[in-house]
Amino acid sequence: MNKLLVSLLLTLGLTGLAHAAGDAAAGQAKAAVCGACHGADGNSPAPNFPKLAGQGERYLLKQMHDIKDGKRTVLEMTGLLTNLSDQDLADIAAYFASQKMSVGMADPNLVAQGEALFRGGKIAEGMPACTGCHSPSGVGIATAGFPHLGGQHATYVAKQLTDFREGTRTNDGDTKIMQSIAAKLSNKDIAAISSYIQGLH
């Protein structure tokens, strides 16, 4: 019995170390290397680089691990994460998650179509609304690892949706939910929904 208890405690302890919580204060210094593309506070000034500010820790951590492990290809980040430990990545994720994402503006001509897709999906084609995973306000569900979209650059969102549709981005889990959704979006759909997301808050 005692051996079982000790074994259990050791296992729990090791698990806790393997999934150590991120330290936002420590992450600020470690995130300096990210600033050139993503902005010092995670609000990227360049529309092709995603805003990381206010993004859920779980999502950020998964993306960094996927990029580091080669499960998601981002040419601009090649080699940048190689020498960072799991704790470094957790700290960086915690720092960016603690920041506030800035909000952009949607193209007025695309708002109606974008909102209809985001809130209603394309039911006839079996595409669910984005709100189910990303919430009506676009903040996502951090605990489930569903990303915060509201305020994200339209250029970046459009690129990701296109990559999911074309199969060049595949790190959306075993269910391939984003690939199946993006497959039902036309170029015009992607432009409208991406613009709507940029202005969503």
Curated annotation (Swiss-Prot):
Compartments where located: Periplasm
GO molecular function, one term: heme binding
Keywords: Electron transport, Heme, Iron, Metal-binding, Periplasm, Signal, Transport
SUPFAM superfamilies assigned: Cytochrome c
Any GO CC annotation of this UniProt entry: periplasmic space
Leader peptide range in chain numbering: 1-20
Protein's UniProt keywords contain Kinase: no
Database matches in InterPro entries: Cyt_c-like_dom, Cyt_c-like_dom_sf, Cytochrome_c4-like, Cytochrome_c_Oxidase_Subunit
Pfam families assigned to the protein according to its UniProt record, in alphabetical order: Cytochrom_C (PF00034)
Binding sites annotated in the UniProt record for heme c 1: 34, 37-38, 77
Residue positions binding heme c 2: 130, 133-134, 178
Domain of life assignment: Bacteria
Known role: Diheme, high potential cytochrome c believed to be an intermediate electron donor to terminal oxidation systems.
PANTHER family per record: CBB3-TYPE CYTOCHROME C OXIDASE SUBUNIT FIXP (PTHR33751), CYTOCHROME C4 (PTHR33751:SF9)
Protein name per UniProt: Cytochrome c4
Organism: Pseudomonas aeruginosa (strain ATCC 15692 / DSM 22644 / CIP 104116 / JCM 14847 / LMG 12228 / 1C / PRS 101 / PAO1)
